[in-house]
């Protein structure tokens, strides 16, 4: 008795040695016969040409294919919210979870409640790997990860123009002109 036979005898018991387990019929033999019959009828090329490579078995009852949540052919949706209290903030989080962009106009709220609301929605946005951007005074944009937010005019808008009332007309023109670029200031 070989080593492998001994291991089989120990693991499977004596039934394996009697050959009773070899009597089971397997479906593999039937599949091999069907494959040979198809090749004999038209060859391998005929079976490939007759089948539709894009047929995913849609005619099968009870298909297990489930669409991905949030992926649709519909246009992107933007929710503009003007909350009056912090109690309305969960609606903003729910909209973000539904992959909708949210613009919060917090001018109607008290400053401390507005700060709390921004912190709450910013935390929810961070949790879903989203983006946040300040659009204006007390106006914020929150977007899910499927939306790309770019800000091209932020540097130009952040440089305020300062004009003093006591300055003469020549100084006003100097202050009112566009600021010089940062890379040119070092050369002066």
Curated annotation (Swiss-Prot):
The lineage of its organism: Bacteria, Bacillati, Cyanobacteriota, Cyanophyceae, Synechococcales. GO terms for biological process: division septum assembly; FtsZ-dependent cytokinesis. The keyword Iron-sulfur does not apply. InterPro entries: Cell_div_SepF (IPR023052), Cell_div_SepF/SepF-rel (IPR007561), SepF-like_sf (IPR038594). It comes from Synechococcus sp. (strain CC9605). Cell division protein that is part of the divisome complex and is recruited early to the Z-ring. Probably stimulates Z-ring formation, perhaps through the cross-linking of FtsZ protofilaments. Its function overlaps with FtsA. It comes from the Bacteria. Its main location: cytoplasm. It holds the Pfam family SepF. It is found in: Cytoplasm. This is Cell division protein SepF. Belongs to the SepF family. GO terms for cellular component: cytoplasm. The keyword Signal does not apply. Keywords: Cell cycle, Cell division, Cytoplasm, Septation. Homodimer. Interacts with FtsZ.
